[in-house]
């Protein structure tokens, strides 16, 4: 996969991972590079939800561990990250607000394997994200690209090809473990 961003040797971009199951069976690991030099706030929000560093208002770790991919559309994208409600309606940030502003639209949705923020309109970024499975130029200037899959695109393809009903996977697609490499 061609990289839109090359990390410098001095400050390499962080790499995070998801270990995924489908219906309780292991699918494997997805590793993602976060573009901290271009989208520092967006990348840090995602990174902390991968590591569990972020705490809920009750002081408990919050993040992607044990959350599900709730929306899967073949030849488009796989969407997850709603650890609040699990259905695409929840939003949380590490910044103490339910949402944060679009950081920028420098990077484009021009290839499969891009990590981008799901939202419900301008400046409504939270915890939800999606991974593209094809180029999606119609999302440019609407969703913030902040990373890319560097390993495990085969796992993304397995998720993309799982059976769905109204774009919801028929079996749970779960992030059973996540963190930073």
From Swiss-Prot:
Residue intervals of the PPIase cyclophilin-type domain: 17-180
EC number: 5.2.1.8
GO-annotated cellular components: cytoplasm; nucleus
Keywords: Isomerase, Nucleus, Rotamase
Catalyzed reactions per annotation: [protein]-peptidylproline (omega=180) = [protein]-peptidylproline (omega=0)
GO biological process: protein folding
The keyword Isomerase is annotated on this UniProt entry: yes
Alphabetical list of SUPFAM superfamilies matching this protein: Cyclophilin-like
Entry GO MF terms: cyclosporin A binding; peptidyl-prolyl cis-trans isomerase activity
Localization annotation: Nucleus
Listed Pfam families: Pro_isomerase
Keyword Ligase: no
Superkingdom, natural source: Eukaryota
InterPro entries: Cyclophilin-like_dom_sf, Cyclophilin-type_PPIase, Cyclophilin-type_PPIase_CS, Cyclophilin-type_PPIase_dom
Record PANTHER family: PEPTIDYL-PROLYL CIS-TRANS ISOMERASE, PEPTIDYL-PROLYL CIS-TRANS ISOMERASE D-RELATED
General function of this protein: PPIases accelerate the folding of proteins. It catalyzes the cis-trans isomerization of proline imidic peptide bonds in oligopeptides.
Family stated for the protein in its record: Belongs to the cyclophilin-type PPIase family. PPIase H subfamily.
Record's protein name: Peptidyl-prolyl cis-trans isomerase H
Organism of provenance: Aspergillus oryzae (strain ATCC 42149 / RIB 40) (Yellow koji mold)
Lineage: Eukaryota, Fungi, Dikarya, Ascomycota, Pezizomycotina
């Amino acid at each position: 996969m061609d990289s839109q961003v090359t990390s410098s040797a001095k400050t390499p971009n962080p790499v995070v991972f998801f270990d995924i199951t489908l219906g309780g069976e292991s699918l494997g690991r997805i590793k993602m590079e976060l573009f901290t030099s271009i989208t520092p706030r967006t990348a840090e929000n995602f990174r902390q939800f991968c590591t569990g560093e972020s705490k809920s208002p009750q002081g408990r770790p919050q993040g992607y561990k044990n959350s599900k991919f709730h929306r899967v559309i073949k030849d488009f994208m796989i969407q997850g990250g709603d650890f609040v409600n699990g259905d695409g309606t929840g939003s949380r940030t590490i910044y103490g607000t339910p949402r944060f502003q679009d950081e920028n639209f420098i990077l484009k949705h021009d290839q499969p394997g891009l990590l981008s923020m799901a939202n419900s309109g301008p400046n409504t970024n939270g915890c939800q994200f999606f991974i593209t499975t094809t180029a999606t130029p119609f999302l440019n200037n609407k969703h913030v690209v902040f990373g890319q899959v560097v390993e495990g695109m085969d796992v993304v393809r397995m998720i993309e090809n799982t059976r769905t009903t109204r774009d919801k996977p028929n079996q749970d697609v779960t992030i059973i473990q996540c963190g930073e490499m």
